[in-house]
Amino acid sequence: MSEYMDDVDREFINCLFPSYLLQQPVAYDLWILYLQHRKLFHKLKNTNLINADENPTGVGMGRTKLTALTRKEIWSKLMNLGVLGTISFEAVNDDYLIQVYKYFYPDVNDFTLRFGVKDSNKNSVRVMKASSDMRKNAQELLEPVLSEREMALNSNTSLENDRNDDDDDDDDDDDDDDDDDDDDDESDLESLEGEVDTDTDDNNEGDGSDNHEEGGEEGSRGADADVSSAQQRAERVADPWIYQRSRSAINIETESRNLWDTSDKNSGLQYYPPDQSPSSSFSSPRVSSGNDKNDNEATNVLSNSGSKKKNSMIPDIYKILGYFLPSRWQAQPNNSLQLSQDGITHLQPNPDYHSYMTYERSSASSASTRNRLRTSFENSGKVDFAVTWANKSLPDNKLTIFYYEIKVLSVTSTESAENSNIVIGYKLVENELMEATTKKSVSRSSVAGSSSSLGGSNNMSSNRVPSTSFTMEGTQRRDYIYEGGVSAMSLNVDGSINKCQKYGFDLNVFGYCGFDGLITNSTEQSKEYAKPFGRDDVIGCGINFIDGSIFFTKNGIHLGNAFTDLNDLEFVPYVALRPGNSIKTNFGLNEDFVFDIIGYQDKWKSLAYEHICRGRQMDVSIEEFDSDESEEDETENGPEENKSTNVNEDLMDIDQEDGAAGNKDTKKLNDEKDNNLKFLLGEDNRFIDGKLVRPDVNNINNLSVDDGSLPNTLNVMINDYLIHEGLVDVAKGFLKDLQKDAVNVNGQHSESKDVIRHNERQIMKEERMVKIRQELRYLINKGQISKCINYIDNEIPDLLKNNLELVFELKLANYLVMIKKSSSKDDDEIENLILKGQELSNEFIYDTKIPQSLRDRFSGQLSNVSALLAYSNPLVEAPKEISGYLSDEYLQERLFQVSNNTILTFLHKDSECALENVISNTRAMLSTLLEYNAFGSTNSSDPRYYKAINFDEDVLNL
């Protein structure tokens, strides 16, 4: 397949899909997806599907261009705010202006309706507002919009503010009339600053009392705030997160109104917004892998990793392609999460998520009633984590390894942003869960939007736990174990809820916790794994389908396997976050990974090929564990009964002179066929009456790396392939190389000499026919099709008379060569081409002696070829569907293969060679193993090395 792919196709493929996946067997399926939409990608340069990678979140996609008046108005307002810096009016693009303007004026949802839509009656363009609107209060214009985090704080402090409404009203009555307007303008900001410390001094970062006092001072400034200082704050806002980055840490009071505080451990919880790094890359300046000695190494990795790919496609292109692997996070129907438009750039819990789930806040309700409701909610099953999963699950019968990374943008941390309230990992897909043997279940009705089904709806079937066996740990817990030995759920005997329900994330989740560094499978039995991860850390999560393990990485450092024995299960990427935490995700589609996933994958490929090459020796080593029992059996039962069970003796008992052991009962063959059988080139005796039957021996392949059987067989196959392709001179050169390599050392040269004699006989026997086919190849490659037809008539007179299809292929190729060499400016050449086309039509389409099925096929091909006459330069101008007729692949390689196979069939010779059969059979075998998810060498827990083999890329493209 790869020989027909040009550089343009490969460039698209490398941009569209992660590089490590293109080295797996799944690469074949990815190529199929691309080739099915190949025409779409070749027209992308003239469409809007490419966004030049300037707008990863999709803001402004598909919008009309701003009018000059609208652009000028937006430019003026933003320049007055001082947020455009030194960017010139001509250099800034429309999408950037819209994005920045919408940040400072969030009520504007559609600029094309407000500024650029023509009035149908007056045929005029409406402008933004009157000039008087431009002279609004400077403080109101320059005050940055509240961020999502600040909205979360408002939602948490609203109860306290409502409780003090009466006091606030009394204070307002005492204020002067001149201050009323200013107080109204900044009421929201004062409410926020009463709870938030904006001091950026690192020394006071952990001092809660000082921060509270300073917050009160800021809240008392009111309308006397300096406009210049407000403008300086606005200058720091280049995107919706810069305003947060200007704060080093924001203390969150952990009284009863803090709805997501669940333990005394988080009594010092602080909010750490994203850093001020302008880069959207996954590279991080702060590296903490959990192992201090690896910090320097990780720093070097990060400095050279996380680069942007050349993928400039819109995210919807993967939906068009039918991409069957994860590409974005799933939006939850209960609005528990805020997700960027592309589904990966930004993910955080909805600040108002808890208010949706608990009760409707009403201004008419009394403070005591609200306190009772709040206390009732906190003492019941509240949800601490908002969860989501990827849009696609992982097909375990296609993948070798799957890997993705997240970068932590902001955290709520108790350790100076060194930890986070984030859980990353994988979740079992609903249909992979086994029915429980116990009827006991714990209600999860309070956990909205976190069911196990991918659709996002709550379903009590998500409480199903795996069946089979269980083990007792003391007298306090029952663990229900999967077949591989992984605990999927744990229920306390006393009926208390488990960890997944305590925090609100799903059952059957295998995750790495950012707040304590533990790994958990949704049970109380968490295990120490690594250090916690915090802000700016890049955490990777991979699943290895070869050995059935899940592993994690931190800032490019592999942390080791976290879970094992997870074979034959279907997973989906999963993440859980508390409010105040946010992440950016990399599925490998738009950015390279920080971790060297290709190097990790190559190590497993090396193990796989090592396992294949010494597979029979591995069988011997396995038998060595039972060597004592084998000796006892031999003593008791005699050597005759033990002979069939001793793998070592079977391996050493190979008859090098008579051929394979499985051929002993076959009919007697002549010397030539016997020699072919010896090198696996003869007739396959497993076929009886055209049906493949199971052989009565365990080993049908007696090749070994310990002797010369494997290289000798390959040398015969190569010679056979060269002769089959008509490359007789190359075959002779290959024979000379074999003669030089055959060295007589203690009689070990006999096998090599047998190969040389076999190849000599094959060349001598086929030399005449090989020369004929070699001459045909030369004439076809030179485009001398007319001479080729005459040569075949002279050397094999009856061939063309009995093969009308070959005659048509040759004459059609001759017609194509004429079109390829013709000039559109020469009228005589055009006339000759038309006459030649009519001649072919009369000979192959209108001749009633030709069967109708052949005439229809000839007519279709000739119609496609005739369409090339409509183009002055068909190689450049014609669509690829018909310009392919003029390619070298069609006029040279394909034409020779058709001619060569026809000659071999006419001479009653095999039209296939042994090497091609081995390759096709190997492809079929690997495909079958993947399709049925076959076990490893001996059982389901052994590594499944065949999953790492990409035969075409690893072997055939060396």
Curated annotation (Swiss-Prot):
Disulfide bonds: none
Family: Belongs to the VID30/GID1 family.
Native source organism of the sequence: Saccharomyces cerevisiae (strain ATCC 204508 / S288c)
UniProt domain LisH: residue ranges: 710-742
Pfam families with a match to the protein in the record: CTLH (PF10607), SPRY (PF00622)
Subcellular location: Nucleus; Cytoplasm
Region Required for interaction with GID8, residue ranges: 710-742
Annotated stretches, region: Required for interaction with GID7: 754-835
Domain of life from the UniProt record: Eukaryota
Lineage summary: Eukaryota, Fungi, Dikarya, Ascomycota, Saccharomycotina
Ranges of Basic and acidic residues composition bias in the record: 209-224
Keyword Repeat included in the entry's annotation: no
Cellular component terms per the entry's GO annotation: cytoplasm; GID complex; nucleus
Induction: Increased in low ammonia conditions.
Ranges where the B30.2/SPRY domain occurs: 390-592
Domain CTLH span(s) in chain numbering: 769-826
Residues with PTM N-acetylserine: 2
GO biological process: cytoskeleton organization; negative regulation of gluconeogenesis; proteasome-mediated ubiquitin-dependent protein catabolic process; regulation of nitrogen utilization
Residues carrying Phosphoserine: 147, 246, 248, 277
Other information: Present with 1500 molecules/cell in log phase SD medium.
Complexes and interactors: Identified in the GID/CTLH complex. In the absence of stress, the complex exists as an inactive anticipatory complex (GID(Ant)), composed of VID30/GID1, the E3 ubiquitin-ligase RMD5/GID2, VID28/GID5, GID8, and the RING-like subunit FYV10/GID9, awaiting a substrate receptor to form the active E3 ligase complex. When cells are shifted to glucose-containing medium, the substrate receptor VID24/GID4 is induced and becomes part of the complex, named GID(SR4).
InterPro entries linked to this entry: B30.2/SPRY (IPR001870), B30.2/SPRY_sf (IPR043136), ConA-like_dom_sf (IPR013320), CRA_dom (IPR013144), CTLH/CRA (IPR024964), CTLH_C (IPR006595), LisH (IPR006594), SPRY_dom (IPR003877)
Chief localisation class: nucleus
Biased composition (Acidic residues): 163-208, 624-639
Protein name stated in the entry: GID complex subunit 1
